[in-house]
């Protein structure tokens, strides 16, 4: 009996143990499940490479050549997300289903995407002008870099040149150079306000960027649109509760080409020996002859044999591993009648070239309030940055590999301190040549939109903007690294530039569509005032070794200067777009603009554009071409102007001579002879393009041909000495042809 009891207890124990082992397995089997299926388009064709992801995990797969997939989900309650380029995403909760077939719907955004244009918006398929759009998520791929760099890769016909200096503004060219001497930079429009450039934008605040390239798109901006237009739309608040977004990005910035192939000491002397032989000179004795004959201005008494003991890599001495940090905090809040977006950004850059650095802080506030037919809004942005730089790259470029960094036998501690460029590491370590700059920028805009409901499609808008900028810079050059015989000693200068701008818009928009017709009209006025005040004081033979010349009283002298002035523009603009049966497109714009930079007779210029488009893919004879989603032919002709010249071109201007003549008296001379004939520089452009989208919008792009001719070009013409003035404004012609393919 006792034996039976023991056996029974043992059996029960084994049974409990087996149940304990099996139940977790059953539980896991109940959670993990294999889901299979097929993904097709609306026509039933299989889609290859569709991403299938279990939400909340990293568990995912893609469809095969037949559009089929298989995935083991961890929880059958977790949604499966199906995503594919050109189609809307779809989420499905498996539940108890183990076979899930999915039909993805085409994403119409590619074709019906709304682009921002001058004083309004338009569907991409209805665009006749040449416009490229870049969204914020596309720019986010350019991590660590400036957002301007993404324009070159994402907008066809755009060139971006960046010198790599921390905080520097890249040079941007749209379809080449349109003006030789009067500026070729495009016009920046941020939230409808002209001017400010890319420095007035924090890349984290950008919602989208539109690049306007041809006259059909830019003519309405008059003179300022001659070199293309870049429209930046910043983020606005969205309905919902208070949301915070914190973003940090950091990284290293190594020198892009550290191996410059600089000659070693041995290679240098071999080249010099060959050079002497080529001109018929006798070879030198490495043990007796000093190095001076190799370089006529060099005074070192050492021989080649002594020099061969040194092989210095000067590039390595002045470079480092650069790094950057970018911190952005954004706030988003919105209700039924009001929305707010605010952000603060801090960025620091240490260049891969020693001595170059930048620190910047910026902030933005966008607020909007709606009540009935009226919308009121404000947009404000401010930025402060501090930069430090020294000119050392030019110093390194001509330093010999046999030159020592430090020579204890030399009274100054290093070779030839009298050279014009000085000693690179001594300059670095002691800030003997230093440039510092501080910049503050501020812009605020108040706008009001009114939708006039009693006239369907009619709305009016008025806005006023004020901008302020302050740029201060200091430069210091120690007397230790000036040329031999130079009696200027310590040198320095200090500059202060103040800019102010005011801008006003008032315009009306009418947008209406009937059965077979569509009409979009914009008409309005714009007024601008800009003011500049720039003062520079400079001095030489300064006492002490202060690197930032703060005691400006000791520096005043003949090298001081002041430049200032103000200018005004006023324009009346109009644009009309018409479409018939959603596929025949016509457009025209006209602008009359006046500038205070020209004399009364040439003050006003008239600029216009005409354009047309044909959406061929909507025709009946194209309906059987199923692989073509969009095929649009477009063309335009237009004329824009340029008045980007100094205000004194049409006036006589004088300058003070730095040297004193005529009985030691200060004298003045005529610096610029007034050119009363100066008038608007004109750019005439022709643009022909073919826009396409294929295979359910999976492939899209454009092919374009354009030609731009510039006449009445504004540029400086050098005068002979007998004229008594060095220069005056003149005219020239520039013709160019370009071809472009983008996708």
Spans of model-derived segments:
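Flexible glycine-rich, low-complexity coil/linker segments exposed to the extracellular/periplasmic environment
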Residues: 263, 267-313, 403-429, 547-559, ...
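Short, small/polar-rich motifs associated with maturation and membrane association
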Residues: 1-364, 370, 375-377, 416, ...
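Conserved protein kinase catalytic core
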Residues: 124, 197, 219-220, 351, ...
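Extracellular/periplasmic, surface-exposed regions of secreted and cell-surface proteins
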Residues: 139, 184-185, 191, 360, ...
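Flexible, solvent-exposed loop segments that connect beta-strands
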Residues: 304-308, 482-488
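N-terminal processing/targeting junctions
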Residues: 21-23, 383, 407
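A short beta-to-alpha transition loop/helix N-cap that caps and shapes the active-site region
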Residues: 253-257, 385-389, 642-643
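Short, conserved phosphate-binding/catalytic loop or strand-edge motifs used
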Residues: 168-169, 479, 483
């Amino acid at each position: 009996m006792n034996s039976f009891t023991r056996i029974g207890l043992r059996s029960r124990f084994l049974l409990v143990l087996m149940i304990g082992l099996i139940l977790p397995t059953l539980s896991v089997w109940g959670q993990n499940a294999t889901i299979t299926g097929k993904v097709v388009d609306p026509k039933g064709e299989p889609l290859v490479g569709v991403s299938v992801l279990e939400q909340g995990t990293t568990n995912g797969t893609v469809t095969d050549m037949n559009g089929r997939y298989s995935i083991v989900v961890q929880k059958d309650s977790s949604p499966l997300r199906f995503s594919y380029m050109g189609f809307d995403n779809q989420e499905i909760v498996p539940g108890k289903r183990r076979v899930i077939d999915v039909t993805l719907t085409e994403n119409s955004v590619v074709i019906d995407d709304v682009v921002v244009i001058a004083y309004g918006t338009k569907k991409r398929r209805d665009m006749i002008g040449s416009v490229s759009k870049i969204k914020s998520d596309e720019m986010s791929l350019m991590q660590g870099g400036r957002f301007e760099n993404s324009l070159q890769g994402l907008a066809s016909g755009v060139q971006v040149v960046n010198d790599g200096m921390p905080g520097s503004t890249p040079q941007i060219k749209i379809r080449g150079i349109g003006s030789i001497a009067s500026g070729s930079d495009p016009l920046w429009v941020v939230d409808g306000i002209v001017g400010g450039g890319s420095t007035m934008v924090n890349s984290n605040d950008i919602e989208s960027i539109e690049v306007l390239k041809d006259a059909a798109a830019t003519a309405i901006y008059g003179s300022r649109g001659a070199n293309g237009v870049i429209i930046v739309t910043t983020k606005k608040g969205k309905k919902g509760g208070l949301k915070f977004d914190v973003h940090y990005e950091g990284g290293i910035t190594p020198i892009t080409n550290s191996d410059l192939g600089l000659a070693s000491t041995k290679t240098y002397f071999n080249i010099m020996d060959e050079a002497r032989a080529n001109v018929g000179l006798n070879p030198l004795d490495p043990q007796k002859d000093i190095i001076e004959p190799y370089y006529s201005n060099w005074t070192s008494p050492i021989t080649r044999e002594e020099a061969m003991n040194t092989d210095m890599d000067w590039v390595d001495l002045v470079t480092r591993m650069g790094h950057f940090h970018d911190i952005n905090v954004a706030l988003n809040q919105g209700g039924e009648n009001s929305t707010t977006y605010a952000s603060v950004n801090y960025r620091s850059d240490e260049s891969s070239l020693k001595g170059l650095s930048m620190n910047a802080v910026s902030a933005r506030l966008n607020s909007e309030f709606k009540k009935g037919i009226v919308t009121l809004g404000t947009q404000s942005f401010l930025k402060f940055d501090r930069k430090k730089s020294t000119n050392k790259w030019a110093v390194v470029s001509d330093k010999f590999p046999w030159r020592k960094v430090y020579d204890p036998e030399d009274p100054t501690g290093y070779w030839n301190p009298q050279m014009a460029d000085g000693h690179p590491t001594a300059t670095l370590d002691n800030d003997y040549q230093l440039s510092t700059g501080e910049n503050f920028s501020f812009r605020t805009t108040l706008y009001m939109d009114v939708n006039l409901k009693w006239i369907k499609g009619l709305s009016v808008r008025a806005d006023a903007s004020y901008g302020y900028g302050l740029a201060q810079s200091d430069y210091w050059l120690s007397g230790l690294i000036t040329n031999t015989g130079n009696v200027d000693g310590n040198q320095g200068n200090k500059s202060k530039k103040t800019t102010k701008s005011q801008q006003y818009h008032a315009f009306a928009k009418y947008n209406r569509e009937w059965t077979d017709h569509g009409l979009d009209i914009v008409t309005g006025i714009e007024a601008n005032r800009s003011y500049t005040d720039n003062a520079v004081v400079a001095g030489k033979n300064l006492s002490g070794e202060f690197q930032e010349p703060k005691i400006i009283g000791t520096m005043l002298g003949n090298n001081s200067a002041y430049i200032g002035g103000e200018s005004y523009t006023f324009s009346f603009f109009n644009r009309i777009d018409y479409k018939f049966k959603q596929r025949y497109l016509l457009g025209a714009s006209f602008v009359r603009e006046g500038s205070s930079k020209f004399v009364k007779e040439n003050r006003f210029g008239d600029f216009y554009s005409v354009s047309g488009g044909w959406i061929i893919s909507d025709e009946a004879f194209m309906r059987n071409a199923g692989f073509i989603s969009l095929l649009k032919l477009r063309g335009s002709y237009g004329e824009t102007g340029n008045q980007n010249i100094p205000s004194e071109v049409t006036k006589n201007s004088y300058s003070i001579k730095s040297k004193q003549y005529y009985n030691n008296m200060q004298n003045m001379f005529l610096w610029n002879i007034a050119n009363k004939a100066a008038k608007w520089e004109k750019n005439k452009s022709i643009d022909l393009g073919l826009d396409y989208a294929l295979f359910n919008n999976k492939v899209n792009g454009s092919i374009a041909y354009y030609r731009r001719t510039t006449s009445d070009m504004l540029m400086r013409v050098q005068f002979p000495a007998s004229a008594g003035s060095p220069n005056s404004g003149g005219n020239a012609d520039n013709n160019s042809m370009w071809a472009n393919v983008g996708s």
